[in-house]
Amino acid sequence: YDLTERILPSWVDTREPSLDERDRHWVERGARALGICLPRHAGDYTWMKVTRSRPIVEALLKEKVLLPVTGKAENGDTLELVIHRDNLPLLKQAADGTLKAERTTFLSPFDSLFWALRRDELFWGFHQALECYLPASKRVYGYFSLPILHKDCLVGRFDPKLERKTGTLILKSLFLEPG
């Protein structure tokens, strides 16, 4: 361990950012992380209130740091979305069909995919619900259901339970989405 100024190169800006600089950074970070998103989701990614993020998104659109994109929701509605300019190569690959999702993975209910309000429903027609806080009689999917992401689709969810004494993972329930 040592003092910051003795470790970091001289070209690193160590000044504390202003609140405006910090918030702009967080909105950009949210937009980069989400790929394509509703304008409000760029700030929602870091739990920023929309009243604070909206003018930042508008400024980033004017500066062409964020670019407008028109898309379709899962239900067919037209959506006015934004994409960070750093993500344009990925958008081109997706449009060309060369961006391929090849894996199946289990997601945490706390995954950033679900942070933005109703993003899962808008883009995938999937409603992620954390039911561990509900009484057992009101749960639909289980205590701690994990979404299943197969390639680029949320295809279902399952409720696992670890039997600690034996080290056995028990699948309490499995729900697959239609289609």
Regions found by a protein language model. Give the residues of each.
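Long, low-complexity intrinsically disordered regions
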Residues: 1-106, 111-114, 119, 126-130, ...
